Amino acid sequence: MPNPTQRFSNRVADYVRYRPDYPPAVVDTLRQHCGWTGPVDIADLGSGTGLSALGFLDAGHRVYGVEPNAEMRQAAEALLSSRQNFTSIDGRAEATSLADHSVNLVIAAQAFHWFDVAAVAAESERILRPGGYRAVLWNLRRTTGSDFLDGYEALLQRFGTDYAAVSERYADSQALALYFGEDGHDVYRFDHAQHFDFEGLRGRLLSSSYAPAPGHSQHLPMLDALQALFDATSANGKVAFEYDTCLYVSTPCRASSALPKPRTPALS
C-alpha cells in the first residue's frame, strides 16, 4: 500500500471541491458529551484540507491542524487563512509537536485508518489535558440502499487499485478498542448526503486515493463505467451520495440524556 502521507498529493483539488463536510450536529454533540461551556483547544490529527476544522472554528474553538502532506496542508492554509483560531502544523498524528497536556480534544476525521494506532494512542495521552477526550469521525459512504449506491460499490470493487484493503481499515473494532482503551467509547450516527451531477460525481470518485488516476490503464474504462452508472440511475440530473456520519468519542463521563442515543452503526 502506498505511503499514507503521500496518497492524496495529486488529488487535492478534487478533494477540496468534492469531499463532504460534516453535519453541524457533530460539533454540538461533542459539546454536550464533553461538557464544554466555552471554547476549547482541539488537535485535529490528519487534518487534510481543513474540512473537519470548519465546524469547530465556527463554534469559536481553537484548532491545531496536524497534517504531514504538504499539498493537503497548503490547501487547508488557503481555505482557513482568515481564521485566527486555526494553527497549521507540519506533523504526523504519531508525533504532533504539540506541548504536553495542551488540548481538550484530540480528533481524527476521515484519517484514523491511516495511523499507527498504538503510537497515536500514546501521543494523544501525552497532549491531552486531564479529563480530555479522544474522538474519531468518519463519513462512511453507504454501499447499498439504492441502485446507484449498489452500482457505485460494484464499480469500486472492479476498478479500485487497493479499494478492498483500504475499506477494511475503516471503523476497525480492534483498532478503536486499542485507541480508546479501558474507558471505552460511545458512538453517535448522523445521516448525511451529497447530490451530484456527473461532473461532481466524477470529481468525488477521483478524490479517492484508490481510483485509477489519469494515465492508468483503467482510468478511462472506469470513467466510461461511471457515466453508464450515472445515466442509468440519476434522477433530474443528480445522484444521491449517502453517508452514515459516525462519531466515536471516549467516555470518561457519560453523555447527557439530551444527546442522540449512542448506538453502534451497521457498517458494511
Features from the language model and the residues they span:
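A short, conserved alpha-helix within the catalytic core of class I
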Residues: F115-S124
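Conserved class I S-adenosyl-L-methionine
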Residues: M1-V40
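Short catalytic micro-motifs in class I SAM-dependent methyltransferases
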Residues: Q110
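A short acidic, Gly/Pro-enriched loop at the edge of an enzyme's catalytic core
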Residues: E94-L105
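Class I SAM-dependent methyltransferase SAM/SAH-binding core
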Residues: D41-A43, T49-A95
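Conserved catalytic/acceptor-binding region of the Class I
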Residues: E125-Q194
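Tryptophan-centric aromatic hotspots in well-structured domains and transmembrane helices
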Residues: N10, D14-Y15, Y22, T29, ...
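Conserved Class I S-adenosyl-L-methionine
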Residues: T49, S173-S268
